[in-house]
Amino acid sequence: MVIAGFLLLRTKVANAVECGLKCGQRSACASFAVEYSDSPGSKLCELNTVKAKSHPESVVRKKGFQYYDQAEVFY
């Protein structure tokens, strides 16, 4: 699934961990979706400015994508 209308950045990554790191590097990023596939190579990573639970009306099922909320980490 993805969140329509709140895209911050669309980029290519090697895996979900890299997509999550890109989200963590941007203060405006609240969640991300990454393309999943068994084939090697780059995958599409979409960073969002909101979380699905705050905008459920904008959640769209998109085949081949896995959604993640950005973890809140305090140092």
Identify the role of each PLM range.
Residues 1-75:
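Extracellular disulfide-rich cysteine clusters
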